[in-house]
Curated annotation (Swiss-Prot):
The gene is LIP1P. Its EC number is 2.8.1.8. Belongs to the radical SAM superfamily. Lipoyl synthase family. Binds 2 [4Fe-4S] clusters per subunit. One cluster is coordinated with 3 cysteines and an exchangeable S-adenosyl-L-methionine. Its cofactor is [4Fe-4S] cluster. CDD domains: Radical_SAM. One of its GO terms (biological process) is lipoate biosynthetic process. This is Lipoyl synthase, chloroplastic. It comes from Sorghum bicolor (Sorghum).
Length: 368
């Protein structure tokens, strides 16, 4: 079975060169998660957006469907969380990457304009708000020489998250190719600070590939985190079109495999965007490749184009097709699959099933 996703990528009618990702979490959890940001770097020392190039612009034949239209973010929880994050000078991928779920997540699952009954979900990036890569799908700003990391950020982030009284948190970061270890030690310090302030908290880290440095992967994987997440983003054939040249399909698989091997009971997770021109068979193969290295959790969502300078949307995948991918993912062995048009990497990251999955894995590995 193959959908119109099989249409080959072509230079669009309009000239020009995608941000994405986080979603609602249940009561007692917060997703502090990440949008992967990676592409050819701009001029040294300047902060900018992804460069224009082929495969960009708007495709007049592809119209945004009604199921993707959302109200502008509002609501008391949204306003309070935005104020709190601003006062704490924390960077959120919700804002930086123009996430479509910001209203729903920050209102605790109640939709863009109303409040839900869960804990508001925010997406916090450590290591600053400027990425050293510039993938064509991502709206996060880029620079070859971003400001140095704030040495107080690990403690300040831990203090902020601990004050929110949550029991599950997702941390993420921009890529930092300018740092010797890609920022792994800074990331690990944040995890350890969180665990010290609140020993029972479950921590998910959505990481870069650290340029394939497996020692950096080990450092973070052994920092005390509970879920190691790293996104392959798209199918093998589209990697060089979608991601920065320094990223790669096999490199990402190697990172996930090494993280899995670092500690017994480690939960690993990845994410795939749809609507970029991939075929059904390519999506199936990507799922099989992820399962072959033991990845436990998979999220699939629609790629949304932030500006005309980002990758063109080739298809808006229907909710019914996303349901098909959820069922297919479960059939090949993923322990949890979140699949839908607005699903992002941290979608329902801390929901009860995932929390139980992590805790059961801990119990099983400690008793074996």
């Amino acid at each position: 079975m193959q959908s119109s996703l099989a249409r080959p990528l072509r230079p669009p009618v309009l000239a020009g060169c995608g941000g994405r990702r986080g979603h609602g979490a249940p009561r007692g959890s917060v997703s502090v998660a990440r949008c992967r940001a990676e592409a050819a770097p701009p001029t040294v020392g300047t902060a900018s957006r992804a460069p224009a190039g082929p495969y960009t612009g708007r495709d007049p034949e592809v119209k945004k469907p009604a199921w993707l239209r959302q109200r502008a973010a509002q609501g008391d929880k949204y306003a309070r969380l935005r104020e709190s994050i601003g006062e704490l000078k924390l960077n959120t991928v919700c804002v930086e990457a123009q996430c479509p779920n910001i209203g729903e997540c920050w209102n605790g699952g109640g939709g863009a304009g109303g409040e839900g009954d869960g804990i508001a979900t925010a997406t916090i990036m450590v290591l600053g708000d400027t990425c050293t890569r510039g993938c064509r799908f991502c709206a996060v700003k880029t620079s070859n020489k971003p400001p140095p990391p704030d040495p107080l950020e690990p403690l300040n982030t831990a203090l902020a998250v601990a004050s929110w009284g949550v029991d599950y948190v997702v941390l993420t970061s921009v890529d930092r190719d300018d740092l010797p270890d890609g920022g792994s030690s800074h990331f690990a310090q944040t995890v350890r600070a969180l665990k010290e302030l609140k020993p029972g908290i479950l921590v998910e880290c959505l990481t870069s590939d650290f340029r394939g440095d497996l020692e950096a992967v080990s450092s973070l994987a052994n920092s005390g985190l509970d879920v190691y997440a790293h996104n392959i983003e798209t199918v093998r054939s589209l990697q060089r079109i979608v991601r920065d040249p320094r990223a790669g399909y096999d490199q990402s698989l190697a990172v996930l495999k090494h993280a899995k091997d670092c500690r017994e009971g480690m939960i690993t997770k990845s994410s795939i965007m749809l609507g970029l021109g991939e075929t059904d068979e390519e999506v199936k193969q990507a799922m099989i490749d992820l399962r072959a290295i033991g990845v436990d959790i998979l999220t699939l969502g629609q790629y949304l184009q932030p500006t005309e300078r980002h990758l063109t949307v080739r298809e808006y995948v229907t909710p019914e097709k996303f349901q098909f991918w959820k069922e297919y993912g479960e059939s090949v062995g993923f322990r949890y699959v979140a699949s839908g048009p607005l699903v992002r990497s941290s979608y329902r990251a801390g929901e009860l099933f995932v929390q139980n999955l992590v805790r059961n894995n801990k119990t099983g590995s400690s008793s074996s």
